[in-house]
Amino acid sequence: MASELPMSPHLEQIHGEIRDHFRALANGFQRLDKIKDSSRQSKQLEELAEKMRDCKRLVKEFDRELKDGEARNSPQVNKQLNDEKQSMIKELNSYVALRKTYLNTLGNKKVELFDTGAGVSGEPTAEENVQMASTMSNQELVDAGMKRMDETDQAIERSKQVVHQTLEVGTQTASNLKGQTDQMGRVVNDLDTIQFSLKKASQLVKEIGRQVATDKCIMAFLFLIVCGVIAIIIVKIVNPNNKDIRDIPGLAPPAQSRKLLYFRE
């Protein structure tokens, strides 16, 4: 059994993690058979693909540790460990092929929903994939599985780059919008200040207008008084014997004409 192989503690830890991933993959594919909704099946397949990528990373790490410890192990132990590595790679590739089969089956179901019967799809069916996998050698399965995983990793990296670029554009747009929002806030504050200044100026103009109107009324009243006094003076001068008009205080009455008296001898 694999657990009885002589391994270093770190190599044994990696081996245990790989086996845990294999059990999780087996359980995941069992649950996948019970799922009827295509969208949920797609989501489950994505989760299984993520576990396969982790498993592939662990297998590579297992291979590196194995190569680093070859000098410390006997040829027989190295052969057993290499056989275990090939067994894990083959098991991983079987899950990769199984996922591909489910993807093709799911794709065929979607095509059947929209197919008009005019043509035939060129994609291999699930049965063809199983037959193809059964005719391939272990090394061919390993190479095909690694190639498929590399293609998946490249697609994920491209998706990550697109997401990163989208985030950069979104961040730049948000920064520009924030700057424009701050500028609009300053403009609104300036408009409020101008409006307040205009209100104060309007109130000041009204106050000055009221003061000017009051001064004009006073000047007009004084002008009427002066005109009245002048009119009375003129009347007194023209008709000094008019008793209907009282004497103006401070104004001396007009001098009476003097008559010269002379005596006859």
UniProtKB/Swiss-Prot annotation:
Main location: membrane
Any Pfam family hit: V-SNARE_C
Vesicular side: 239-265
This protein's GO CC annotations: plasma membrane; plasmodesma; SNARE complex
UniProt name for this protein: Novel plant SNARE 12
Subcellular location: Membrane
Family: Belongs to the novel plant SNARE family.
Coiled-coil stretches: 32-106
InterPro entries, per the entry: NPSN/SNAP25-like_N_SNARE (IPR044766), T_SNARE_dom (IPR000727)
SMART domains: t_SNARE
Membrane spanning residue stretches: 218-238
Phosphoserine modified-residue sites: 74
Keywords: Coiled coil, Membrane, Phosphoprotein, Protein transport, Transmembrane, Transmembrane helix, Transport
Molecular function in Gene Ontology: SNAP receptor activity
UniProt tissue specificity: Expressed in roots, stems, flower, siliques and leaves.
Native source species: Arabidopsis thaliana
Recorded superkingdom: Eukaryota
Function: Vesicle trafficking protein that functions in the secretory pathway.
Membrane topology: Single-pass type IV membrane protein
Every t-SNARE coiled-coil homology domain range: 146-208
GO terms for biological process, alphabetical: protein transport
Segments in the Cytoplasmic topological domain: 1-217
